[in-house]
């Protein structure tokens, strides 16, 4: 029997999305710790993406640390635009005053889907909605509540 019948053809490698490393300036985990020392009453929300099949639908999970509550939003693609659209929708539906009380600080990993912090932090008029901080690479323990649920 020919060997080609038994083996599947090789898949081409997909091009990885490049993450702008400049977006992390002033948003590192050390900056997060400093901010929390200055603002201990801030509501912290940890965000992460849960992928199933590559190229398939993706979950955006938001874990509220103080409330021990986790929300999940289904996205069609694992890109920055889909994350921004979810926060835009929440901002409109909850109204700015309620959104500001619920989402104060957002702690994220270094995924390409979170590489546009300006769109998350500010609304269309330039008003600050929340503050975005990033965990260090390969440090899932820094947002342990989100990773364990």
Residue ranges and their predicted role:
Residues 48, 100-116, 138:
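Acidic/histidine-rich, metal-coordinating catalytic segments
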């Amino acid at each position: 029997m020919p060997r080609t019948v038994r083996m599947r053809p090789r898949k081409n490698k997909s091009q990885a999305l490049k993450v702008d490393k400049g977006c992390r300036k002033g948003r590192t985990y050390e900056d997060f710790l400093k901010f929390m020392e200055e603002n201990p009453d801030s509501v912290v929300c940890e965000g992460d993406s849960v992928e199933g099949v590559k190229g398939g639908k993706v979950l955006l999970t938001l874990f509220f640390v103080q409330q021990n509550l986790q929300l999940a939003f289904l996205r069609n693609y694992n890109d920055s635009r889909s994350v921004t659209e979810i926060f835009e929708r929440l901002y409109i539906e909850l109204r700015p005053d309620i959104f500001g009380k619920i989402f104060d600080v957002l702690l994220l990993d270094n995924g390409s889907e979170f590489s546009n912090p300006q769109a998350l932090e500010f609304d269309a008029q330039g008003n600050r909605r929340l503050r975005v901080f990033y965990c260090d690479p390969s440090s899932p323990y820094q947002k342990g509540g989100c990773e364990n649920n």
